[in-house]
């Protein structure tokens, strides 16, 4: 359990999958964090992050192992992409549109990791480096805290729209993630009949917790990449 942003967050499992639909309206002027999961209450913090770059590339980083990977697979402006962060044991992975983005990143930590918090855009638990070596210090400054954003940027049209955010208390397979993206029951999708039911979010606490956490991060980081109320739909629609 974690209490923060005046909201009590409850997590039921060390394994998780966080899935969201994102639309990047235009290229940023610099590398920009999109989605981050904080893994455990430790110093320095462990986290897994997905960022998007000015040259339309995806970038992933697993803090704690100094693993920084930039993928050649591009993101497309104004196109809806499904992004997912997944933790299975101590292996972190990122999926884009149901396909793995690079290899799983094993995190060399003795104790099991668990989700401690999530955020969209810049995060207040960012530290002085982004998990790389000294040559990456300039890049880490690009992921600066929102308080360093100029007043002129506040209130401008957001670069990213985030919808359909779901938190699951287990890893999902590619078939299940495609079913979420296509918004159809998994059981109707061929030719993979081994999946009998559609995946369900953590019920009922986790979807509510994710909704509150997302609201808190959007409001707190108004000077960052995302502004205003997050366009999150009714997250209880799949509880039935």
Curated annotation (Swiss-Prot):
Query: Annotated region Disordered: where?
Result: 127-158, 221-240
InterPro entries xref list: ConA-like_dom_sf, Sialidase_trypan, TS_C
Question: Keyword Repeat: yes or no?
Answer: yes
Q: State the top-level EC class.
A: hydrolase
Reactions catalysed according to its record:
Hydrolysis of alpha-(2->3)-, alpha-(2->6)-, alpha-(2->8)- glycosidic linkages of terminal sialic acid residues in oligosaccharides, glycoproteins, glycolipids, colominic acid and synthetic substrates
UniProt function note: Developmentally regulated neuraminidase implicated in parasite invasion of cells. May contribute to the pathology during T.cruzi infection by cleaving sialic acid from cells of the immune system.
**Misc. comment:** The parasite mammalian stage surface antigen exhibits extensive antigenic diversity.
In Swiss-Prot or TrEMBL terms, this protein is called Sialidase 85-1.2
Q: Which organism is it from?
A: Trypanosoma cruzi
Gene, per the UniProt record:
SA85-1.2
